[in-house]
């Protein structure tokens, strides 16, 4: 895979499965005609939760997927082996017992890293820019997750959709799949101190925030704040601050005609060049290219 800086707005998605990769898929409808998915059984009830497709993957090298502008939230939970996923401009290692949640309309990529198979379950949503995505501002990007139940739900859904195809059974399986994603994406046990702190930060994204400021709001030490954020969000406090700023920037690029420099200042970047470089690293394209893509 080329370095991120080499990815141009004209680049295309990449799908490399290789001869040893195996997968099973359930899709919401027949609109997706890609070779690897077009023969999969259909469960229309998935669309009630805006789910496009779900599946299990046994990936082996040279397995590699690149999505330049992923059109929906994507959750991956590993149950054996390990692989790499590109999240927020950085490659993150995903091992067994770990999940990753990617928000919509950003660059996403995944690949194998060793000769051993990487086995995971995934759920891919299809969301429009005007709808509220599954991934929220307090959703973790990575974190501990027992994939057993989600894997079983996807296997059950596939078996039912391939066999009896009873609506009542499909309903229960699809509900379980969605609820297991929600359990990871919107944890009810989220630390109240973090919630209050990030609520205040989101209301003042244009100001300069330093780690001591954040720790003071949360009433914890700087080191404890780092540990809390790592545990709850899979990010450092500074990384999550950047995430919130870029989420707001994407919204402003979509709904306003403000100049990029104006938006950069509004979300807390003193330099438009720093804003542009950071935006490209996390989202996969520069702000001006991102805005242009919204018009197509």
Question: Where are the predicted features?
Answer:
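N-terminal regulatory/effector-sensing and dimerization cores
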Residues: 1, 43-139
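N-terminal low-complexity or simple alpha-helical regulatory segments
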Residues: 1-43
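…primarily DNA-binding HTH/wHTH and HhH modules…
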Residues: 1-12, 36-37, 266, 276-296
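Short helix-to-turn junction characteristic of helix-turn-helix DNA-binding domains
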Residues: 78, 201-205, 253
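Residue at a beta-strand N-cap/secondary-structure junction
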Residues: 84, 208, 257-258
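Short hydrophobic/aromatic patch on the recognition helix
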Residues: 97, 225, 229, 274-275, ...
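An amphipathic alpha-helical interaction segment
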Residues: 119-131, 137-206, 212-216, 220-224
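Terminal helix-turn-helix DNA-binding modules in bacterial transcription factors
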Residues: 199, 212, 230-272, 276, ...
């Amino acid at each position: 895979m080329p370095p991120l800086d080499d990815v141009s707005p004209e680049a295309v998605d990449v799908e490399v499965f290789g001869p040893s990769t195996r997968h099973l898929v359930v899709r919401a409808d027949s609109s997706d005609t890609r070779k690897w998915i077009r023969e999969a059984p259909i469960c229309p009830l998935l669309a009630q939760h805006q789910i496009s497709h779900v599946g299990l993957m046994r990936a082996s090298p040279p397995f590699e997927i690149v999505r330049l502008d992923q059109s929906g939230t994507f959750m991956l939970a590993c149950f054996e082996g390990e692989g790499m996923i590109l999240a927020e401009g950085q490659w993150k290692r995903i091992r067994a017992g770990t999940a990753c949640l990617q928000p919509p309309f950003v660059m996403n990529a995944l690949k194998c890293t060793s000769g051993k198979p990487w086995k995971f379950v995934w759920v891919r949503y299809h969301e429009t820019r005007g709808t509220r995505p599954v991934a929220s501002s307090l959703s973790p990007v990575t974190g501990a997750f027992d994939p057993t139940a989600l894997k079983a739900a996807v296997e059950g859904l596939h078996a039912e959709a391939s066999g009896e195809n009873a609506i009542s059974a499909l309903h229960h399986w699809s509900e379980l799949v969605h609820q297991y994603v929600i359990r990871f994406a919107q944890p009810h046990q989220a630390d109240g101190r973090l919630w209050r702190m990030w609520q205040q930060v989101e209301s003042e994204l244009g100001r300069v925030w330093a780690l001591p400021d954040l720790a003071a709001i949360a009433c914890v030490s700087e080191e404890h704040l780092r540990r809390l954020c790592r545990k709850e969000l899979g990010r450092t406090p500074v990384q999550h601050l950047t995430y919130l700023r870029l989420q707001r920037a994407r919204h402003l690029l979509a709904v306003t005609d403000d100049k990029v420099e104006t938006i950069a200042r509004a979300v807390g970047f003193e330099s438009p060049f720093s804003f542009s470089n950071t935006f490209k690293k996390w989202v996969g394209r520069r702000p001006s290219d991102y805005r242009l893509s919204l018009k197509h």
